[in-house]
A protein has these predicted regions:
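Surface-exposed, short loops/turns at beta-strand junctions within beta-sandwich domains
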Residues: 1-4, 95-100, 189-194
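Extracellular recognition modules
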Residues: 6-12, 68-70, 102-108, 162-164, ...
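Short, solvent-exposed loop/turn segments at the edges of extracellular beta-sandwich modules
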Residues: 12-20, 108-114, 202-210
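Interdomain boundary/hinge segments at the C-termini of tandem beta-sandwich modules
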Residues: 27-33, 121-127
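Proline-enriched interdomain boundary motifs that mark the N-terminal boundary
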Residues: 33-42, 127-136
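A short beta-strand segment in extracellular, disulfide-stabilized domains
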Residues: 47-59, 141-153
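Solvent-exposed loop segments of extracellular immunoglobulin-like
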Residues: 59-71, 153-165
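Surface-exposed, flexible coil segments in extracellular/virion-facing regions
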Residues: 71-95, 167-188
Length: 212
């Protein structure tokens, strides 16, 4: 049923060919026509980042509409919990999110308390652990540093590397080393200037690149 409809019963008594009719009381089935609206699409952010505020289309219905946002860290088919204070048509997730989280909005009409859940959207967190590289070395001028051993980076997406160097110390300005894009790096022999090195790891997931 999609339309509010009233009903009554007509009773007829027939005696000696004479039909007499009477109507019962009238009852009404009220249809609470609640349309949930919609909320914004999935997002991917770097760990600890700030998701964009969720845009939405407001719900419409026969009564007064109220909202409650819910979240789940076990996916759209997982268990959802109410987010305290999140009772507007839109919602802005606080910055600092470190766990992939799904969200949905529940719209409720005060007319007979009908509630409708919206589509679920997911904020995917692109986590990245940068790994580590070998310890400091001291060489003679013009010598050949030992190749830098390392622990590989791990992340949610595809991992790429870029080695950088600085002749002004670890707090100085670093520049990319051309072609140095592997997990390890071997400095060419002949180094005559004290040089600092670091490896930048990047995890790319859903077109979002996160570096450490």
């Amino acid at each position: 049923m999609t339309v509010t409809t009233s009903y009554r019963r007509v009773a007829t008594s027939t005696l000696n060919g004479v039909a007499c009719s009477a109507n019962s009381n009238c009852i009404t089935v009220t249809v609470n026509d609640l349309t949930p609206g919609s909320i914004a699409a999935d997002q991917t952010i770097c760990s600890g980042g700030d998701p964009a505020g969720f845009t939405s289309v407001a719900a419409t219905g026969s009564g007064t509409i109220t909202y409650q946002w819910q979240s789940s860290t076990t996916g759209c088919n997982g268990t959802f919990s109410n987010i305290a204070g999140a009772t507007l048509a839109t919602y802005d997730v606080p910055s600092g999110l470190t766990v992939t989280t799904s969200y949905r909005r529940v719209a409720t009409s005060t007319l007979n308390g009908v509630a409708v859940q919206l589509n679920c959207i997911t904020v995917t967190v692109n986590n990245l652990t940068p790994g580590s590289i070998a310890a400091d070395q001291t060489i003679c001028s013009g010598g050949d540093p030992a190749g830098f051993t390392s622990v590989a980076a791990t992340g949610s997406g595809t991992i790429t590397y870029q080695w950088q160097s600085s002749t002004t110390g670890c707090n100085g300005t670093f520049s990319n080393i051309a072609g140095a894009t592997l997990a390890t790096y071997d400095v060419p022999s002949g180094l005559t200037v004290t040089t600092s090195y670091r490896r930048v790891a990047t995890s790319t997931l859903n077109g979002v690149a996160c570096s450490a």
